[in-house]
A protein has these predicted regions:
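Exposed beta-strand-loop-beta-strand "reactive/processing" segments of non-cytosolic proteins
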Residues: 58-105
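Cysteine/selenocysteine-centered motifs that mediate thiol-based redox chemistry or coordinate metal-sulfur cofactors
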Residues: 145-156
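A short, surface-exposed interaction/processing loop segment used at functional sites
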Residues: 111-143
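Polar low-complexity intrinsically disordered regions enriched in Ser/Thr and small residues
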Residues: 11, 49, 66, 78, ...
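Negatively charged, low-complexity tracts enriched in Asp/Glu with abundant Ser/Thr
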Residues: 3-71
């Protein structure tokens, strides 16, 4: 009986570590989607301010651009995927730092279920995706599918 409980706890810890890794990969996919969107906006149809666009592209190419990114914050029950923006207003206490600006989604630490946020602290009621389903997991980890603005999280 005790041996079974130990094995069960080991499996739970393994599942949690996979969910954490998938949540981080999911955040990277959303960040890549934003990067692709930003580059597309700068290059596609001719930017209304070409000097600004060229300056932005040069910063991206030399690695000094501070683009919006998505990061995972660990909570008691959920991983919170947070949109972080670089603060450029010099009156802010976060000047020249990334700061969390909004919640993109929640990922259940136990199951890998993905939720749209209802508020900063709480997910919406209905599960939108499940990382235990291989098809849905592959969908979430592909940057072409996950929109940085979160449109894919609305009920289908």
């Amino acid at each position: 009986m005790t041996q079974t409980k130990v094995i069960g706890e080991s499996v739970k810890r393994t599942d949690r570590s996979f969910v954490k890794a998938y949540a981080n990969d999911y955040a990277k996919a959303i960040t890549k989607n934003y990067f692709d969107y930003h580059m597309n906006q700068l290059t596609r149809f001719g930017h209304p301010n070409p000097d600004y666009a060229n300056e932005q592209i040069a910063e991206i190419e030399n690695g000094s651009a501070n683009l919006m990114k998505f990061e995972v914050r660990e909570g008691r029950k959920y991983y919170k995927v947070v949109q972080s923006e670089f603060e450029t207003w010099n009156g802010s206490k976060y000047y020249q730092q990334y700061r969390d600006s909004s919640v993109h989604s929640f990922v259940d630490k136990e199951t890998g279920e993905v939720f749209k946020p209802a508020s900063w602290n709480r997910p919406a009621k209905h599960v939108r995706y499940d990382m235990r389903d291989e098809r849905q997991l592959n969908y979430l980890l592909d940057s072409r599918n996950v929109d940085w603005a979160g449109g894919y999280l609305y009920m289908r």
